[in-house]
């Protein structure tokens, strides 16, 4: 079953915000500077990786996704999501994510870029699952801009797929939050701005982005 995110229907309260015009100009300039290398990566059979048997004593502090469009740096929250980050560290250290596509982008209702499936179909996983942790409350914008969380197909079905939120998003409180993007969110916004292949608001990004390698710093 494809690991898909279901948008939550919520009553939204309109709030008047005053944002300097310069802020929008800076954001557009940042996205305009993104350059992506052409890549020849293709769909892969998920690498066989054994699940970890013990939690890490010292988890990663930052995780850097080196992509064909630049680096995306994630500050992790090991204290809140030790199981998730132990598993992800195991997969990342094994090279599970190397040369894989970010296969899904959404720009209607929810605003995410989804990665972590070597098959590129949305159904790939490492062959094992693990429980949820660090779930947010069921409130508006409970997955704010910059959030990094696990994708799943139901309770306690986490695998390898994760998503990056590029604009404040409201979802059911069902997806483990394990980090926050501190650098490179402009790359995600650039991919999202390119739209969906074939049109629509949910699907394969028209602008290709692949994870070349991942660097973990503890």
For each of these PLM feature ranges, what is it?
Residues 2-8, 12-218:
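Cyclophilin-like peptidyl-prolyl cis-trans isomerases
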